[in-house]
Amino acid sequence: GTEANGFQANFNGNGHTITNLRINTNQKFFGLFGKINGADIKNVGLVNCNVNNTGTGWDHAYIGTLVASTEGGTLENCFSTGIVNGSVCVGGLIGATHQTTTTNCYSECNVTGVENVGGLIGNPDGAGNHVVNCFASGTVKGNKNVGGLLGSISSEVVNCYASGAVSGNESVGGLVGSGWSSYAIKNSHSTGSVNGKLYTGGLVGWRGNASITSNCYASGNVIGEKYT
C-alpha cells in the first residue's frame, strides 16, 4: 500500500518466511507493506532483511521490514531478522503504528535511524495502540527518541522486553526512548546496555505526563550525561 492508498485486505502467511528482502530507497513509507489501513497481517517471518533509506527528515520517514506505517488493523505472530537503516520513524519490524494492536511479534534486526527509532516499532503513536507479548534483541542506534523496543510512544505496552544495546543522544531508553502523554508500560523489562547524553534510562529515557509503569525492571548498564 502507498501513503494515499493503504493496503486494506488481510494477509495470512500461514507460518511461511520470506528470505533476503532487499529495499534501497530514498522515499517514504517503505517496507514489505508500505502502508496498511485497517488490515490484519499475521503468521509471517522475514529472514535476513536489508532495508536502507538514504533520505533524511520527515519527507523520508516510515521505514520497517514488514510494514512502514499502519492506520488501524492488527499484526500478529510476525518476526524479522536483518538490518534496517532509515531516518524518522524507523523500526526493526514496523516504522509507525496508529490505532493498531501488535501481538506476539519480535525483531532481531539491528536498527539505525535519526528520530523515533525502535528495535521493533519506531513510533507507536496514540492511545489506541497496544503492543503485547513482543520483544526485540538487535542493537538500536539513533539521535533522538531511541528505544530497544519502541522509539517514542503514547500507547500501552504489556509483557514485552528488549535485550539489545541502545545508543543515542536525547531520550534514549533500554525499552522505550520517549514516553509521551497517556502511556502505560506493564510487566515489561530491558536487559541491554544504554548509552545516551540527555534523558537516558534503563527502561525509559524521557517520561512524559500521565504515564503508568508497573511490574517493570531494567538490568543493563546505563551511561548518560544529564537527566539519567
Q: Which residues fall in each region the model found?
A:
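Surface-exposed repetitive/solenoidal architectures
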Residues: 1-228
